[in-house]
Amino acid sequence: MAYCLQCGHQADLCIPTGDSRARLVCPACQYIHYENPKVITGTLCVFDGKILLCKRAIEPRLGFWTLPAGFLELGETMCDGAVRETKEEAEAVAYMPRLYTLFDIPHFGQIHAIYLAQLKDGQFGAGTESLECRLFAPSDLPCDIAFASVAQTLDYYKKDVARFGNDLASYPLHQTVITT
């Protein structure tokens, strides 16, 4: 951003009074532009013990497998965003969602929130951002997973299945910082 979002004047990079970080500040109207992390939200949808994955039709990681997920939109909760992304990417209805994994990814300026949910009626299809969608048994997951947060979520799920069986309500919330 080179220009003020409020008045259009050229913004300067400086440390505002009372702050400790350099930010873009408008010298004309004093508007401070804060760049904050983006929230990515999605679901780990389960049907008959199998996990719904989508093969990406877009970059980044075109052709790799991922959970249905995407950027949170203004005005929606993380849970609503996760359900929406599942509908958009996998033409699926996620129900009974609850927060399952939360990842801080500071080097990308992102937070990933994945909800554990049930796949309604086992129905799904490929949305416009997916080449295909498929159900996988935890023991049969593909090795070409798109993102570290997805791989870690799938690993947590496999361990929780081994520990708690199919009692999804017993699965704990996992919180992790990804640094690489």
Whereabouts are the PLM-identified features?
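Unchanged
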Residues: 72-156, 160, 167, 178-180
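Conserved Nudix-box catalytic region and its N-terminal flanking loop in Nudix hydrolases
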Residues: 46-88
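Conserved hydrophobic "DFG−1" position in protein kinase catalytic cores
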Residues: 45-46, 53, 117, 135
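Short connector loops at helix/strand junctions that flank enzyme active sites
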Residues: 21, 38-40, 46, 60-62, ...
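Acidic, metal-coordinating catalytic segment for phosphate/diphosphate chemistry
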Residues: 1-42
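Short, highly charged C-terminal tails/helix-capping segments
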Residues: 171-175
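Active-site donor-binding loop signature of nucleotide-sugar glycosyltransferases
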Residues: 28, 56, 69, 117, ...
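Beta-strand-connecting loop/turn residues
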Residues: 22, 48-50, 122
